[in-house]
Amino acid sequence: TNEFIYTLNENGEVLIEIVVQSGQYSGVVSLLGTFNIFPGDFISDVYDPNDDERVITVFFPILRLPDLNPHTDLINQVYEVSRPIPNTGLISSQGDFAQNSDIARLGWKLSGKDVKIGVISDSYDRISGVQNSLGDAVVRDIDNLDLPGGANSVTVLQDYPLGAASDEGRAMLQILHDVAPEAELYFTTGFVSEGNMAAGIAELVDAGCDIIVDDLTYMKGPFYRDGIVADAVNEATSLGVSYFSSAGNFGNRSYEANFSASASPNGIRHDFGGGNSLQQLQLEPGQYIIALQWDDDFYSLGS
């Protein structure tokens, strides 16, 4: 099973999002109860407490998925929760030197003191999976002064809860500690779902973060309007938080056009040019994710 498409657990369950028909949240909760799934099993994705009844994120038995099909009176749609794409490069960072922040610290006595910085990425301490104490890699980073320790240790609001991950968030925090060694550093995962990431942004704001950075892109996020993550970012910046994202520039990896009907009898097909309703793609061997979107409403976003 492709881990870039599906998130599975050891119980034969897949992580899904259930888009609830308007006003039917309690009905869906009752329905899930017949599968022995209860609100305590839901993944935390409450960004706006006044608007938490559109989407339920939960692990669901794979073999029982067809049993949801008859309940269109309660459920608008169900889809898998795909992991976001981390925008990481192939070269080790020399960010402190490249942006001359090392010179700024010397010339203006800047250290990041009294500044809170939040990081959103896949994980902080999950390279060996979920564990109850600090992993060896984190302890080593603190001992090597790559991360702050003692009273100024990184505050982890939520680490990735679903198994092992790459700890890219810890790598980002190492860079920030180089640049601003006295800053207070915070981390939360954004690797569970869009709703969970949006909730994480709000939690970092509530924690008093002055700056938030992330390196994630959700391919299912709306292309033609703001989604729940963008709404959370907009709310953060409206409160004075500086937000920086390496969301990725996919412009040169995409195709966008207004619909142009093909000639009869294929009028419902898009004409890519020259009467061609089939766009040819040449791909090298490997794994690819192709995302298609139309400028339509998103029911899960209330439109």
Task: Annotate each language-model stretch with its function.
Residues 1-166, 171-178, 184, 215, ...:
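Autoinhibitory N-terminal propeptides
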Residues 164-178, 182-303:
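Substrate-binding/access-modulating region of protease and related hydrolase catalytic domains
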